Amino acid sequence: MRSIANKKLVIATHNIGKLQEITTLVAPFGLTIQSAKELGLPEPKETGTTFEENAYIKAFAAAKNTGLPALSDDSGLEVDALNGAPGVYTADLALQSDGTRDFLKAMQKIEEKLQKIGAHKKSQRKCRFISVICIAWPDAHADYFHGRVEGSFIWPPRGDKGFGFDPVFLPDGYKNTFGEMTTEQKHGWKLNDQTPLSHRACAFKLLAENLLKLS
């Protein structure tokens, strides 16, 4: 498994919320980072059918265009009662005709589907967030790191922190949704300290221990 020798890394995302979270996680490692948006890179079409495929598409596109290693996160929400949907298509569920994303409408769509099948109890609303982090190099080499967190889909949404589906995700064993947690509480992890909570922090801990050669 490679290391990031030159300490330069491109974050392959145009999602402001995701960029902020990744930047927070990367901060302790002394890397010089730039985002795909800052560099004016186009957003590649996510044509993959798995989190791994879409993470690679984004990371390799940025690496190829910059000549630097690039990190991408592809993540989504899997709801058991909906046979794992929306899954890899989570972000697409929020996509509007004008190209913007409305996550409140997306959350409402999931709630309507759960209501339609009679999934009213918390025990019927089990779900999880999945994160796959890919770091790709210009020569097409890639490393992957996986994370997940179990919880329940709650309604109505609670909290105005975080982004995406955070307000409707209640992690197992907690009273607050991700939307009610600070970034630090949501991640639940710092270098050499604590066990990670969020799916993204779980994946990043593996990245830190293996690719960044830290523990």
UniProtKB/Swiss-Prot annotation:
It is an enzyme of class 3 (hydrolase). InterPro entries: dITP/XTP_pyrophosphatase, ITPase-like_fam, RdgB/HAM1. One of its GO terms (molecular function) is XTP diphosphatase activity. GO terms for cellular component: cytosol. Its cofactor is Mg(2+). The active site is at D74. Pfam families: Ham1p_like. Mg(2+) binds at D74. Coiled coil: none annotated. SUPFAM superfamilies: ITPase-like. Binds 1 Mg(2+) ion per subunit. Its EC number is 3.6.1.66. Substrate binds at T13, H14, N15, I16, G17, K18, S75, F163, G164, F165, D166, K186, H199, R200. It catalyses: XTP + H2O = XMP + diphosphate + H(+); dITP + H2O = dIMP + diphosphate + H(+); ITP + H2O = IMP + diphosphate + H(+). Transmembrane segments: none annotated. Keywords: Hydrolase, Magnesium, Metal-binding, Nucleotide metabolism, Nucleotide-binding. One of its GO terms (biological process) is nucleotide metabolic process. It comes from the Bacteria. HAMAP family: Non_canon_purine_NTPase. Belongs to the HAM1 NTPase family. Homodimer. Pyrophosphatase that catalyzes the hydrolysis of nucleoside triphosphates to their monophosphate derivatives, with a high preference for the non-canonical purine nucleotides XTP (xanthosine triphosphate), dITP (deoxyinosine triphosphate) and ITP. Seems to function as a house-cleaning enzyme that removes non-canonical purine nucleotides from the nucleotide pool, thus preventing their incorporation into DNA/RNA and avoiding chromosomal lesions. This is dITP/XTP pyrophosphatase.
